[in-house]
Amino acid sequence: MVIPAGTWRSGRITLKSNINLRLDKGAVLEFTGDVDDYQPAVFTRHEGVEVMGAGAFIYANKAKNIALTGEGVVMGPPMDVAMRKFPNGNSVVEKDVDYRMPVKQRLCDGKEGRTFYRPKSFAPINCKNVLV
């Protein structure tokens, strides 16, 4: 998948197996600050704790042979967007997550007053053969 030169706005991008996300020179991939653009919640880790949350701007889970290449730029949301003002939970994730709950029930998606952990830039989780 090629992102050509120019500025492109996006919510979460999920890479599947055998995909190379290439940003051409002059491409700027800017991610939105809208919490809804990172739904539904996906399996991720926050400070090593498994939860269902926003994941990452560029996300993959159990994918093989994936790549993020090129000379373009990946940008997080601007500072003035809602996501950056959203309550981010306690300073210690263990205070937000009940370890007795199955991971699928550990929702940190920002919905209905739940905690929201901001997405990481790139998170290949449980993936094999990753090239950056």
Task: Tell where the protein language model's regions lie, with residue ranges.
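Extracellular/periplasmic carbohydrate-active domains that bind, remodel
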Residues: 1-132
